[in-house]
């Protein structure tokens, strides 16, 4: 079973995905985690990702789509994926549809996590203390939230 969790940054997609991974024995596909991994590698792509994320922008779809393609082509993960924050754009949705068709898969359920801006800010402030994520400063989060809502 393949699932999609969508919602603004800080809505709890990652938290819910982790719970579902344990319950369903699926694999979490977290674009945020994948992008942070690329940043850690300090590659040219990682530097571009860091620049975009630091400025509250979403990372270019071509970069994200390639990372997703690598996961969907893994036969061990077929029909066992929980997408956390992907797709975020029409381009990403079209890419996902194409890749699902190519790999003979489908999305079984889509969940939208609807959370207020105030709640998101509170959660991010807590997450910043606990997880110490580089993309969790208040100004960046507000920019990402506003970009998401456009």
Predicted segments with their positions:
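Glycine-rich phosphate-binding loop of ATP-dependent small-molecule kinases
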Residues: 1-150
